[in-house]
């Protein structure tokens, strides 16, 4: 995990400052999503994003938020999808109020920004790479997962 600096008399370790429990040494929330009104710059909502389920020695589902290392992808229908957290989930949020409207468990860390594409069937798909990340300590993997967004007639946006 370190950086040898190739002959320098010192080295660095690039990782967050964590407690013995594997949790950040700062007061939660450790990660959140926020909606901002761009006409006046005011925060409209701020919601905790993530749990410590995959960070702590015990799988505790406390919603304290987790550090984010990837950005969201936003759909024209007003949804934001995030998978760049240190828990093994991809989540969908309603941009109007920041409420979580969907979530799926990933087989490994999804520390990346999701992608989206329009299929030949006319449906929109969300794609997540669950590859993990060695610096965050998440399990590594090699999964590429596609989720079909609901069609407009099924209540999709």
Positions of PLM-derived features:
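A fold-level detector for beta-propeller and closely related beta-sheet-rich head/sensor domains
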Residues: 1-157
């Amino acid at each position: 995990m370190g950086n040898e600096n190739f002959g320098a008399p010192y080295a660095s370790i690039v990782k967050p400052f964590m407690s013995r429990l594997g949790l950040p040494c700062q007061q939660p929330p450790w990660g959140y999503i926020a909606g901002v009104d761009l006409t006046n710059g005011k925060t409209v909502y701020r919601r905790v994003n993530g749990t410590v389920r995959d960070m702590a020695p015990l799988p505790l589902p406390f919603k304290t938020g987790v550090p984010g290392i990837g950005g969201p992808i936003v759909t024209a229908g007003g949804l934001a999808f995030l998978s760049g957290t240190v828990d093994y989930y991809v989540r969908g949020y309603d941009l109007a109020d920041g409420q979580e409207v969907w979530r799926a468990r990933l087989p490994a860390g999804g520390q990346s920004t999701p992608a989206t594409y329009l299929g030949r069937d006319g449906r929109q798909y969300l794609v997540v790479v669950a590859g993990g990340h060695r610096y965050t300590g998440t399990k590594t993997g090699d999964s590429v997962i596609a989720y079909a967004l609901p069609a407009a007639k099924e209540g999709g946006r």
